[in-house]
Amino acid sequence: MDVGYVCEWDKRPRTSHCPSIPLVCAWSCRNLIAFTTDQRNEEEKDITNLIHILDTEHPWDVYSINSGHQEVITSLEWDQSGSRLLSADADGRIKCWGMTDHLANSWQSLVGSEVDGDPIVALSWLHNGVKLALHVEKSGVSSFGEKFSRVKFSPSLTLFGGKPMEGWIAVTVSGLVTVSLLKPNGQVLTATESLCRLRCRVALADIAFTGGGNIVVATCDGSSTSPVQFYKVCVSVVSEKCKIDTEILPSLFMRCTTDPARKDKFPAVTHLKFLARDMSEQVLLCASNQCSSIAECWSLRKEGLPLNNIFQQLSPAVSDKQPMILKWRILSATNELERVSAVALPKLPISLTNTDIKVASETKFYPGLGLALAFHDGNVQIVHRLSLQPMAVLYGSSLRPSEEPSLKRQRSPTPCIHFKALQMSWTSLALVGLDTQGKLSMLRVSPSMGHSLDMSTSLRHLLFLLEYCMVTGYDWWDILLHVQPGMVHNLVEKLNEEYTRQNAALQQVLSTRILAMKASLCKLSQTTVTRVCDYHAKLFLISISCTLKSLLRPHVLNTPDKSPGDRLTEICNKFTDTDIDKVMINLKTEEFVLDMPTLQSLQQLIQWLGDFVLYLLASLPNQGSSVRPGHSFLRDGASLGTLREMMVMIRIWGLLKPSCLPVYTATSDTQDSMSLLFRLLTRLWLCCRDESHPCDPDESLIDECCLLPSQLLIPNMDWLPLGNGIISRLQSKLPLRLQFGKPPVAPSYASVQYEAYTRSPTQPKIDHLRRLHLGTFPTEPCKSCTRCGCVTMLKSPNKATAVKQWEQRWIKTCLCGGLWRKMPHTYS
């Protein structure tokens, strides 16, 4: 475990610091982090409680929301999709936040609820019934369906047809449980009920869910001499009103309070957590005094209730079937620890049965097996989530600035800097912590957890987690933290092997996701950086192909099951003629008829296709050099076939509207550029259409491609924007020191690494999705992708239906699946 980066605020006056304010943070499956700070805003009369949101790749670009919470924010919770956030405060107010225009750095309050004046101590979204299980023992199996299986799990509440109903549940300090349901029409149904008849103070609480659709709430009044109470909560809708039913479950007393030697040593319960949101049978408890803590892990089990002999004699039938009861049993306890300041639990859905734990140990798969404890002395420790045995440790000294003199630290009377809030990433390979100075620290958690693993085992575990993210759609940034340049090639090859083993339907679903994953991996090594360009170009080609084919309509409605796009593919594969007009006459051209404004509006996308074909063919003589972008396309039969189909379609559209054709600068006025390019493209495609037996291009084809620069002006391709993310700078293992609001200066080698493939800052900017030139100083507001850096305008300049259809594809996410963020005005 080591430090990736530390991000801090600009120096503020000491009077603005409120150390007594508790801090909270939450980490979404899309690698967005929401957190609070303990700083006063002295410019305003009232204390404003801000919520800060950042993406882990650009931590300096923090977006601060003036939350409107008048009291301290006590809870933050992301939903399963990572696109909505709940916040709750010490006045009983709950707010639901959503992205404005799907921008990760622009948020607005959507709806909310309130329990007037009653502080919220626990908060959770209702369960949507989706639960996936990781089968570590099947990591070598080819099928993703066997590695990651869907677990039967009922939603907390269902609508008509079994669709899960959205909403949230919260527990207040006075012992109330409140549930708010979001109806499809936007209305909010809220109900509040007491957890039990005798209400008592709730200092700590947590919420978990059962497979049967029930909710389990654990509460404690903060005293270790009091029992930890558990309640079953059932939510229903009766006559358009939300109804809550509660039932008391077995409670427990902490083991440390029943031990005579330590009965009064740990008077306060400071942490109460279920080991997982969908695992209500296991709970972690932590009791503390002023200097030290002790942690205990408990499990709820069914046990037989022994009957007295008298009852067995009275009723022989009873003795045949022993009655069962639920009882809490302690699994493990730690020795006396330094005082615990924060706890973070893993989100990786690994089963915690004894068999599964044994399998994980045998396969040496440790991610998800450990939970993190932060201590008041500044240290962080990973302990096994069941046995509570230490697995890894990070000492607080490594978090301090190296330039700070050690003597000065020893003489300082102030308490040690420590984490007040801690959260684990969704693959359990990273930790984020908020310390007493308001700094945000990103910690790498090694997959080996301190054990010695050979390279092949480490690669296998990283590959398994990448596959998990591919199947679930979660962002994989935290996995990239552990990928070294030497691993990239092997990981990409293995990932492709596993992908090709899946059935055709699943491959189609995951086709764009695996390309985005390969691109982000290849960015981490200078030897594979050109392949990033190829993967982005392939994503763009697939998207254009799908969009243009979707515009085609059958001439007669009662046509066979094949769409015009499918027939285009079939005929282009069947007729291998190098003459574009001979291929075209085999198609029903009436299916390609579109109105003139639509064709003209597509010209920028058509121009990119034409330029890309010309660039690829002109680079064929240099195919021995793998450092040139586009190299992988020259042996990719499927992509060349797609380009060939697009050329045929464009040729037909050119007959209807010649101005929509791609524009080439030719040396001869009589030259048919499209026919020439189609002929060369077809010959290249024939060489590699059979992927099992590809052959090298013949000399005559290479000679003709060598002549292309003398016949046509070869365009410069705009491959990808210069990446300003943090991930490639974290490979040195030295912690980076960053500041909120100030982008770091790009290292000199970064510009050299990308120089051949990107525009320099002084060159005119381009809209990478619309293929529009924006000028050197764009006047339109733009947004960029948090993952690949793709830039596009916020508002559409077009009104054509076909272009709107293209733009609607990228309204929520980039073509690589990354989130959008609004670009600062300095871009313009």
Swiss-Prot record:
Alphabetical keyword list: Activator, Nucleus, Repeat, Transcription, Transcription regulation, WD repeat
PANTHER family in alphabetical order: MEDIATOR OF RNA POLYMERASE II TRANSCRIPTION SUBUNIT 16, THYROID HORMONE RECEPTOR-ASSOCIATED PROTEIN-RELATED
WD repeat start-end pairs: 68-107, 199-241, 264-308, 622-663, 777-816
Family assignment from sequence similarity: Belongs to the Mediator complex subunit 16 family.
Subcellular location: Nucleus
Alphabetical list of InterPro entries matching this protein: MED16_bridge (IPR048616), Mediator_Med16 (IPR048338), Mediator_Med16_C (IPR048339), Mediator_Med16_N (IPR021665), WD40/YVTN_repeat-like_dom_sf (IPR015943), WD40_repeat_dom_sf (IPR036322), WD40_rpt (IPR001680)
Chief location category: nucleus
Function: Component of the Mediator complex, a coactivator involved in the regulated transcription of nearly all RNA polymerase II-dependent genes. Mediator functions as a bridge to convey information from gene-specific regulatory proteins to the basal RNA polymerase II transcription machinery. Mediator is recruited to promoters by direct interactions with regulatory proteins and serves as a scaffold for the assembly of a functional preinitiation complex with RNA polymerase II and the general transcription factors.
Gene3D superfamilies per the UniProt record, alphabetical: YVTN repeat-like/Quinoprotein amine dehydrogenase
Official protein name in the record: Mediator of RNA polymerase II transcription subunit 16
Keyword Repeat listed: yes
A single Gene Ontology CC term: mediator complex
Self-association and partners: Component of the Mediator complex.
